[in-house]
Amino acid sequence: MEYNVKTFKEMLIEENSRHNLVSRKSLPVELEKHIEDSRSLLNFMDLKGSRVVDIGSGAGFPGLVLAIYCPEGEFLLLESDLKKTEFLQAVINRCGLKNCQVLRKRIEEVGRSELRNSFDFCSCRALAMMNIVLEYGLPLLRLGGKLLLWKGKNYSREIEQAANALDILGGKVVDIFTYSLMAERDRAIVVVEKERDTPAKYPRRVGIPAKRPL
């Protein structure tokens, strides 16, 4: 496990020198922060034996980190950017991760595919406001599945603004895990349970959820 984390760090630093996957400012420190933030979920929840889809995986936070630290889970990383998906696949291959796959596709398209209603958990970090991410993530979950949203100090405001989206899409906030990260306080993982089937017309076509949030 620690070998895989070390390999991931080394590959990310190398790739970041060619393509800006994460901020280059104080990269070693920021990298540790991203990893610790991603794995913080495992202090609160057990993903063993679960199917997890990570949306907007980017450079691998939180999905790839969770796959490394939770080999008993099954992870699908969704990312539409070619360079990022190539990087994610390279790390998976180098580390020999058998529990993790990458899919290069837009989230809205996947939400209308055979993968709809098929995951136990959907994770998302630093992608968009909550009312947008709800439309991306809830269609992918089975009934009773949970959407896991990494948020900062304004999470309460985002929850208030997402009330309409929660009602339309069949979700309910059931837990909020708060924690501190290094010198940064007021971090939270907001847990949204899928209580009702999401109407078939959601997610809307590519680009619309972000352009016209519910």
Swiss-Prot record:
Binding locations of S-adenosyl-L-methionine: G56, F61, I107, E108, R125
Keyword Methyltransferase listed? The answer is yes
Keyword annotations of the record: Cytoplasm, Methyltransferase, rRNA processing, S-adenosyl-L-methionine, Transferase
* EC number from the UniProt entry: 2.1.1.-
Q: Where in the cell is it found?
A: Cytoplasm
Q: Which Pfam families match?
A: GidB
Q: Which Gene3D superfamilies match?
A: Vaccinia Virus protein VP39 (3.40.50.150)
Query: What is this protein's function?
Result: Specifically methylates the N7 position of a guanine in 16S rRNA.
Give one GO term, molecular function aspect. rRNA (guanine-N7-)-methyltransferase activity
Any single Gene Ontology cellular-component annotation: cytosol
Q: Which organism is it from?
A: Syntrophomonas wolfei subsp. wolfei (strain DSM 2245B / Goettingen)
Report whether Lipoprotein shows up as a keyword of the record. Answer: no
State what protein this is by name. Ribosomal RNA small subunit methyltransferase G
Please state which protein family the record places this protein in. Belongs to the methyltransferase superfamily. RNA methyltransferase RsmG family.
Classification from the root reads:
Bacteria, Bacillati, Bacillota, Clostridia, Eubacteriales
